[in-house]
Amino acid sequence: MSLFDKKHLVTQADALPGRNTPMPIATLHAVNEHSMTNVPAGMEIAYFAMGCFWGVERLFWQLPGVYSTAAGYAGGYTPNPTYREVCSGQTGHAEAVRIVYDPAVISYEQLLQTFWENHDPTQGMQQGNDHGTQYRSAIYPLTPEQNAAAHASRERFQSAMTAAGDHRPITTEIAHATPFYYAEDEHQQYLHKNPYGYCGIGGIGVCLPPDA
């Protein structure tokens, strides 16, 4: 594979070796000052990838019931990758967001609705003008319940697209969560630190039908 292949996922055998040292990040979330790493009792975690993680993270931190968010890398092979390595296409990772949420306030189903309605899940290894395997659409469930909900929601959204006259197939990857690696601190809450920064996400005008 070419070092700059942007359309095909690297194999585990060809992925970069990475490192053992985790990426240093701030202790507290820049927006709400909650812990960036701890998960309070009763809260749960979700992982989504839907393009450039700057806009995705902001989308989720604004939701009531979301305790914290973090930008990072998921679904790949290279341990503790850097942003530059992920952008090379040689780690297998997608730009992803870790969401810690209170299920008593916001459900996983509501997070899935936000996911489907705010990006284009048909574009394969890109999202809008952002091209590369790191920009693929993906859901990384942590439990059998999350996995079942993710698959069911994909079927409902595909049906809703068809009903709206959009016959493109969904390319969203749904795979059991592998280790999530935090991105460099400069990427955390990027659009809070840089309010006029780039945000490349946007929906296709289709709503996710409710779970029957």
From Swiss-Prot:
**Protein's UniProt keywords contain Oxidoreductase:** yes
Catalytic reactions of this protein:
L-methionyl-[protein] + [thioredoxin]-disulfide + H2O = L-methionyl-(S)-S-oxide-[protein] + [thioredoxin]-dithiol; [thioredoxin]-disulfide + L-methionine + H2O = L-methionine (S)-S-oxide + [thioredoxin]-dithiol
* Catalytic-site annotation from UniProt: C52
As one GO molecular function, the record gives:
L-methionine-(S)-S-oxide reductase activity
Quick check: keyword Transport in the entry? no
Which Pfam families does UniProt cross-reference here? PMSR
| Annotated GO CC locations | cytoplasm
Source domain of life is Bacteria
Name a biological process GO annotation: cellular response to oxidative stress
Keyword terms of this UniProt record: Oxidoreductase
The signal peptide annotation in the UniProt record is: none
EC number(s) in its UniProt entry? Answer: 1.8.4.11
Q: Which family does it belong to?
A: Belongs to the MsrA Met sulfoxide reductase family.
Q: Known PANTHER family for this protein?
A: MITOCHONDRIAL PEPTIDE METHIONINE SULFOXIDE REDUCTASE
* Function description: Has an important function as a repair enzyme for proteins that have been inactivated by oxidation. Catalyzes the reversible oxidation-reduction of methionine sulfoxide in proteins to methionine.
The entry's protein name is Peptide methionine sulfoxide reductase MsrA
The species is Salmonella typhimurium (strain LT2 / SGSC1412 / ATCC 700720)
- Name the lineage: Bacteria, Pseudomonadati, Pseudomonadota, Gammaproteobacteria, Enterobacterales
